[in-house]
Amino acid sequence: MSVVPAANIDEAGAFGELTALLEKESDIDLVLLDLSMPGVSGFSGLIYLRAQYPAIPVVVVSASDDGDTIRRSMEFGASGFIPKRFGVETLREAIGKVMNGDVWTPSDVDLSAGVDPDMAKLRDRLITLTPQQVRVLMMLSEGLLNKQIAYELGVSEATIKAHVSAILQKLGVESRTQAVIVAAKISGNQWRQNEPSA
């Protein structure tokens, strides 16, 4: 049974496949994003998609359905949050609401609870990053060196150094390690899956 009758559904097994699909297809109306999708570290994928494709609504689908995760997803620009434990009917309802311009979250979640002013300030800094800077920060969080990041992104090492400098300035920190710590604070333990190497 199709969740959305008459819809064309494309699937991506990893975040890189998703971004390639978004670059290739111009008629995508909605993205369902799993926070634990390969290639994503917590909210980094959501932040990247909202920066790169602001016109395409993103609905987070996740097994992590605590109030804090849902609130942070919405703060970072998700149009909805659907816990994986919900059935097809709920998924259909949520997608319908989002496609009509509304937002959807579980009714038992208070989106205004637990807002930490310090976290809000850090979040505000993080969302000033460009999509490429978000990608670089994701890779820094994985412990990659500038040379490795440059190779992965197909740019020069000097370009990566410039991105890292801009990231440090925008986040108000002095080192790569501090930038990764800020990113980890913003999304709890969900931003970073691997500790950066020394």
Description of each model-found segment:
Residues 1-10:
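Two-component/phosphorelay signaling modules centered on CheY-like receiver
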Residues 14, 41-44:
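Acidic catalytic/metal-coordinating carboxylates
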Residues 34-35, 62:
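Active-site residues of response regulator receiver
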Residues 38:
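The feature encodes the CheY-like receiver
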Residues 43-55:
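Short amphipathic alpha-helix used as the core "switch/output" element in two-component signaling
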Residues 70-74, 80-125, 187-188:
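Short, flexible helix-to-coil linker/hinge segments that flank and couple to helix-turn-helix
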Residues 143-178:
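Recognition helix of helix-turn-helix DNA-binding domains
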Residues 168-198:
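Basic, Lys/Arg-enriched C-terminal extension of HTH/homeodomain DNA-binding domains
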